[in-house]
């Protein structure tokens, strides 16, 4: 049971990592666009998402350590 839980948590962690990388790519593309209020808003949203994904990755990593 514990091994299944750890595997599930690792899958969740990978999902957060994949989305963090995706959001980082969006930020890189958006930064190339001309400055505008919409661009700035998109950057703030994506940067907030990256921060949240990073926190979730750390949280899941700590849960995985506890489950081992």
Where are these regions (language model features)?
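Charged, low-complexity interaction regions
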Residues: 29-40
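Alpha-helical oligomerization interfaces
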Residues: 4, 8, 41-59
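N-terminal acidic leader/helix
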Residues: 1-29, 59-65
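Residue-level detector of functional hotspots within protein domains
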Residues: 1, 36, 45
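Generic alpha-helix initiation/capping and coil-helix boundary signal
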Residues: 16, 20, 39, 53-54
